[in-house]
Amino acid sequence: MRNWLLPEYIEDVLPRDAYRIEKIRRLIMDMLFAHGYQFVMPPLLEYVESLLAGSGSGMNLRMFKVVDQLSGRMMGLRADMTPQAARIDAHLLNISGVTRLCYASSVVHTVPDEITRTREPFQVGAELYGHSGIESDLEIQCLLLECLSVSGIHSIHLDLGHIRVFRSLIRDSGIKPEFEMELYAALWAKDISSLKELVRTGLNKRLTRSVQNALLLLPELYGDGTVLLSARQHLPDFPEIGEALDQLEHVARILQPYVDRITFDLADLRGYHYHTGMVFAVYTPGCPAPIALGGRYDEIGKSFGRARPATGFSLDLKQLSQLTDMNGYPSGILAPWKPEDEKLAAMVRQLRAEGHIVVTELPGEENQEVTGCDRKLVFRNGNWEIDPVTG
């Protein structure tokens, strides 16, 4: 057996990539701290019921599970830190006002993402609790755009949706949960033939003609700002739909100067099991999958005894690091081994304080290649100076 082999889609991150990931993590966390988001560190393992709170069956399939040898209960390795942050807000902090939390750590999935091809993403996210207005949705989305900007992502396509459009269409229909899930699956996949069949056979006795037509129209409501105009013209005049469209229009108007492109997708039901309002995804050239996801999820705290308005975003730092133009591990300065030389020690301390990498060459390494150093300290005319490494 080759003991150095890793499981499929689990990988070591080597120095150059690890440095880039860590550099971006620090930039993003500094941005989150500057906006008042407080860092939390939830545990890697929790009881399954807690990790699945308000998340639906999809999360259950993505989660590794183990039996707790102390209690006999089933535990899970987190696949998403959002429910953990919600638990902390609802049960541990128990603050009545607005709470801003952020996190950054690894999560694990039973199967790899189709695009990133890893089962161990490094998730960074921010969550805002206790405010139900569109202003908090805007704060989260503006914050995400700033985090992407400091990470070196400058070409951004923002895609907006709103769960309440679909929910308002079926809210009073009295359809069975299994039909609702079939509808959701057809809309999410934009499977027009299945959607037509569902509306024609399984749902036509429950839905009015205007709602049937609206459901069939939803997959076509994708594109630029004309989508909202078409939605106002053809969707039922439900107050909740009108409010959702107003919110989308308002957010798009404010964020338009900061992104390259904004589109709308009224059939985007990603996270339907827990999202309750506006949802969004961010794309960038060179990656067909979203590089960040987020939205409003006002009911998730109910599972922990305290429902709170909430909105947030998350991204995979490993994926993000592959899309930036940031350089890998920086070159260093090679210093000789002279522990008794006070001038040398002072200069090394100064260089390190200025942010330079200084590597001390250990005895016996003089004739070996030292990777990562393109300069060296040399003693000249009574002073230590920096010279380029030649040869």
UniProtKB/Swiss-Prot annotation:
Task: Spell out the CDD domains in the cross-references.
Answer: HisRS-like_core
Q: Name one GO biological process term.
A: L-histidine biosynthetic process
Pathway as given in its UniProt record: Amino-acid biosynthesis; L-histidine biosynthesis; L-histidine from 5-phospho-alpha-D-ribose 1-diphosphate: step 1/9
SUPFAM superfamilies with a match to the protein in the record: Class II aaRS and biotin synthetases
What does the entry list under GO cellular component? cytoplasm
Q: Which Gene3D superfamilies match?
A: Bira Bifunctional Protein, Domain 2
Q: Entry's InterPro entries?
A: aa-tRNA-synth_II/BPL/LPL, HisRS-like_core, HisRS/HisZ, HisZ
Localization of this protein: Cytoplasm
UniProt keywords, alphabetically? Amino-acid biosynthesis, Cytoplasm, Histidine biosynthesis
The answer on whether this UniProt entry bears the keyword Flavoprotein reads no
Does the entry feature the keyword Endoplasmic reticulum, yes or no? Answer: no
* HAMAP family with a match to the protein in the record: HisZ
Q: Which PANTHER family match?
A: HISTIDINE--TRNA LIGASE, HISTIDYL-TRNA SYNTHETASE
The UniProt subunit note reads as follows:
Heteromultimer composed of HisG and HisZ subunits.
Q: Which family does it belong to?
A: Belongs to the class-II aminoacyl-tRNA synthetase family. HisZ subfamily.
What more is known? Answer: This function is generally fulfilled by the C-terminal part of HisG, which is missing in some bacteria such as this one.
Please explain the role this protein plays, according to its UniProt record: Required for the first step of histidine biosynthesis. May allow the feedback regulation of ATP phosphoribosyltransferase activity by histidine.
Spell out the protein name for this chain. Answer: ATP phosphoribosyltransferase regulatory subunit
Recorded source organism is Nitrosomonas europaea (strain ATCC 19718 / CIP 103999 / KCTC 2705 / NBRC 14298)
